[in-house]
Amino acid sequence: MSETSSAPVRRPFHRRRKTCPFSGANAPRIDYKDVRLLQRYISERGKIVPSRITAVSQKKQRELAQAIKRARFLGLLPYVVA
């Protein structure tokens, strides 16, 4: 008695790789004074969102983190959100 499944074999799900929002022709520049842009990359608790969620490249993630920290130091962004 051989066991055969009636369900077809499923192909593994392949998620399309996200592209960096800061690379490209008309991509926004990372600037510590651009608070509206920086707030998109901060969680509701005030933490910097990791690049695996935002799909920012490694180089641009470092620039983004530096800009967020600089804006926090100057008082443009809060360190923590209550």
UniProtKB/Swiss-Prot annotation:
The keyword rRNA-binding is assigned to this record: yes
Gene label: rpsR
Stretch list, region Disordered: 1-20
Domain of life: Bacteria
Keyword field: Ribonucleoprotein, Ribosomal protein, RNA-binding, rRNA-binding
UniProt name for this protein: Small ribosomal subunit protein bS18
One GO term (biological process): translation
Subunit-structure text: Part of the 30S ribosomal subunit. Forms a tight heterodimer with protein bS6.
Source organism of this protein record: Rhizobium leguminosarum bv. trifolii (strain WSM2304)
Keyword RNA-binding: yes
Annotated family: Belongs to the bacterial ribosomal protein bS18 family.
Example of a GO MF term: structural constituent of ribosome
Cellular component, GO, one term: cytosolic small ribosomal subunit
Role according to the record: Binds as a heterodimer with protein bS6 to the central domain of the 16S rRNA, where it helps stabilize the platform of the 30S subunit.
